[in-house]
């Protein structure tokens, strides 16, 4: 049976842990609000960029831009977006499981797969595996800005054009709400207008609603790289908001669990203390009776 002193130490440790998890929950909630505002502001722009590029890509030959060209190749790159820090529930675990499943599926089809990793958690996980990590970025979410999207997007665009890989997919957490995230596998290169923008067209956008100057081909050369930069930034913002939401939920659960443990141990402490006092009283009464 634990001593009363050990039980008091346990209660104090649980209370300290509860204070830490509660503080982390409050910090995550504040960061979530900022990240949520950013992604909600960025989504309409990213979707409109998709709409315009969809319209343009239907008017010109796909071979007019290297990022639109479909290749007959077997080299696949998978961009895996994880966090740099833990304590965010199943946020990273869901990503690495989905990424592993997708990579094995590609390999079963005879494809050669390389990885690009965003975040320390994904990097540390895949370094212990047999797959090749071509590029990695860490510290991106400390002060996330559009410059990070330019850096990541520039590297991936250049390597696609050079033929390092023939198709690019990204695995990331899409932000749905403060308590809900969804793992997404999205194809980025080559840009497939019919597949990627069908949902936008279904909302009522028609192909003849734009007039372009100077001409479609010249605008396409500018908008295709810009489109990928915007989508890369949107994906990073989605992941950042999803991470803060997952961490807030995880710390809220940890705080409540710590409270339950404190109640249980405190109750056990009180029962143990009461039993000890009762035993002492019985010893005193027994000793007094023996002296009579």
Q: Where does each model-flagged region fall?
A:
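C-terminal beta-strand-loop-alpha-helix "lid" module of Rossmann-like NAD(P)-dependent dehydrogenases
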Residues: 1-292
């Amino acid at each position: 049976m634990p001593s009363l002193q050990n039980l008091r130490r346990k209660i104090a440790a649980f209370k300290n842990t509860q204070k830490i998890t509660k503080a982390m929950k409050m910090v995550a909630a504040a960061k979530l609000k900022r990240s949520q505002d950013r992604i909600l502001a960025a989504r309409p722009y990213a979707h409109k960029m998709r709409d315009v590029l969809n319209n343009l890509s239907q008017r010109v030959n796909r071979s007019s831009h290297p990022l639109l060209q479909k290749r007959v190749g077997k080299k696949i790159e998978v961009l895996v977006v994880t966090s740099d820090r833990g304590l965010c529930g199943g946020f990273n675990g869901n990503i690495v499981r989905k990424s592993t499943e997708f990579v094995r599926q590609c390999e079963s089809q005879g494809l050669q797969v390389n990885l690009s990793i965003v975040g320390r958690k994904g990097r540390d996980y895949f370094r212990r595996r047999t797959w090749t990590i071509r590029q990695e970025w860490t510290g991106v979410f400390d002060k996330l800005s559009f410059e990070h999207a330019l850096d990541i997007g520039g590297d991936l665009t250049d390597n696609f054009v050079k033929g390092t890989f023939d198709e690019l997919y990204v695995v990331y957490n899409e932000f749905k709400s403060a308590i809900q995230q969804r793992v997404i596998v999205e194809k980025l290169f080559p840009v497939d207008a019919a597949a990627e923008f069908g949902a936008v067209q279904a909302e009522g956008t028609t192909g003849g609603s734009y007039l372009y100057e100077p001409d479609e081909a010249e605008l396409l050369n500018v908008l295709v790289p810009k489109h990928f930069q915007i989508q890369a930034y949107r994906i990073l913002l989605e992941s950042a908001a999803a991470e803060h939401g997952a961490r807030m939920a995880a710390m809220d659960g940890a705080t409540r669990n710590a409270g339950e443990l404190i109640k249980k141990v405190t109750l056990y402490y009180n029962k143990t203390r009461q039993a000890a006092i009762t035993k002492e009283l019985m010893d005193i009464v027994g000793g007094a009776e023996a002296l009579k």
